[in-house]
Amino acid sequence: MAISIKKRFSCLLKISGTLAAILVTLPGLGQLPVLPTVPSPNAASLGQYGQIPVSNYTGTASVEIPIYTIEDTKLTIPVTLSYHTGGNRLESHPGWVGLGWNMNTGGAITRIMNRLPDELDAPTLPKSGFYYTHGDIDQTDWSSDANMKLPPPLRDIEPDIFTFNFLGMSGKFFLDEKGNWQVQSDQPLKVIFSPGDFLTPFISKYGYAFSAYLTPTFRKFTIIDQQGNQYIFGDTENAIEYSDDIAPKTGTAGAAFFATSWFLTKIIPAGGGSPVVYTYERGPYVSSLYVSTSLTSINGYWKEVLAPGCSSWTQSISTSGKVISPVYLKSISNPDRNIKINFSFSASHELTYKDADYNKIALERYGGVTRDYLKILQRLPAIIPYYRQNDEMALYRRFVWFKLDKVSVTDTLSRQIREVRFNYTDTSISRLELKALSFFSPGGSQPVQTYSFEYNTTKLPDYLASLGDHWGYHNNTAAPFNNQILNYEQLKAPSEGYTKARILEKITYPTGGTSNFEYNLHSYGSIVSNDRRSLVAQTGNASGLRVSKIRSTDAAGQTLTKEYFYVKNYTPSANPATLASSGILDTKPQYNFSVSGIDVGGAGFNYSMFSSSTVIPLAQNTSGISVGYSEVVERRSDGSYTIYQFTNHDNGYKDTAVVNSYNNTYTPAIPFTSYEFARGKPLRTTSYTATGSPVQMQQYSYAFVGSPWQ
């Protein structure tokens, strides 16, 4: 039986293609790779679920445990605990429910900042963000050679990307060249921001020494769904997260204190009814550190850097990072349903950075003399409840990560309906890890249901141990800086055994049944070319994990096994190990590059660079997907199987190159127009008997909603 299903792509408009092509010089030359926008661990884990689909396309399994659901005739609001099976990156800090886990309670909008924040309006750069400057590129000659030669403006010419994930809806939105908010999502959604509705960061109210340099941020965004329900993000002071440079340069303190995430605060049902209200508490600061090394060399005359006939050679080894001001969900309430869900949390004792890591930053940035900026941020106890209660903590101990201890469901008279408690491995020598989840009945002292979890026994190293592969997963191999010419890329190769470190391997359910998970590294049969125009035939392994087998056993001992093969042209008689991988690697790791060109003054130059971080982001998309699979086989215990086929680079969904650039020579920083949003969609799902006879097929077709950029 064949079923044809038609679906629609919602898409970005021409602005994405426009901005991708505005290259006025060779961007980023002479700089270390820029640290991306760093949200809190909770916002990052929430965003991971919205951006990296749990699907065969990415090799990830759906692992979800229901906690509670608020239901009425207008809205269904589930609270669930979910796990992401893609692997544990070494420098990604666990969220408040432990490594790999995420508490799906409401949702958030998280910003991917492109160059400058859209709302930038600071004394040194007044009204310079894209919110104010979008009209600069609303012109017909934006891609002319003359404009390509203009020096980089101090005004922003590229919008930030805002990703969202809430209650089963996910996508992105951004501001276009006419000042309209454009949405990219599989659901028909509308984004509203009220002009002029800005909020000065919270620290300005409490004696912050650099308040004059703060830029007001977007106060709130409203997303409206097809039914007319309104979802409000931000709006209140304690529902917006911020980050700042942990060690700003002299004279720039406070200038980079920007909003990174806006959390869901209210749901207003269409047609009336009481809103669902989310309340938050601002937690103590947390940090995210990184180490980068680079070598750069310039020869010839480059007007903006060198005098005629000069050359430059620079080596840089740097430790830096971000200080983040997170918020934590306190409660969800809905008067119409007489329900309130309370979230109780406390400081964890988990592994974090060493004092020596922070001292190294202080030594490099301040000469080891002062750490005044951190003191200013952290010695404002009126701002953060935890600091009011623990005001005498040592400076670096004031970076504190919370863990969720308990979820209690009560009625509006505080009578308990359900309680869920979380049990962790919580020690200073390991990352926070969820051991068990227990449900209690009202007034009960013993759990009525318990889920327990077991993980791969390989240990993860300390933070900043520099034992990661190309993609940031564990490979237990140091890559010393002096090896950069000979074998740096080989030293960064993935290791399947170490990539599996502390990955979830077993769930035991309250019924006594179990699920066991097996994994292997990603594989690929082709690579997207650096200019994004074509595919290059090349095989290999990429890091991160894909599920290879799931074995589920019930309390009676009955077992169901599912195996997954990420290959092309599978048949029952074929050995999957001999078949070609259907995986496409988004970006090949690259640590060196050289380029020759003409500067804006007409003089020639040669430029080369080595970086300990890849000079091209891995991957070249906002979701972080390194490999996507065009075809995946799911084989069951009885030999029957299903083949899933997906949209990908190789079947009509390539990215497109820039319209124009100055110096038409490839450099890693050249942007492109992304069709990432259109990849990973089902094309065909076909079920077969164990002998290979088809029994059912579903075929999907898609159409763009609006006008795709062309």
Summary of predicted features, one role per range:
Residues M1-C11:
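N-terminal secretory signal peptides that target proteins for export/translocation
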Residues S10-T18:
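Sec-dependent signal peptide recognition
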Residues T18, G28-L29:
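Cleavable N-terminal signal peptides
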Residues Q31-N180, T508-S515, S523, V528-F565, ...:
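Short secondary-structure "cap/edge" segments that initiate or terminate local elements
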Residues V38-A44, M169, V183, P188-S194, ...:
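N-terminal, Lys/Arg-enriched amphipathic/low-complexity engagement segments
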Residues Y68-I70, N88, G98, E177, ...:
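Non-catalytic interaction/targeting regions
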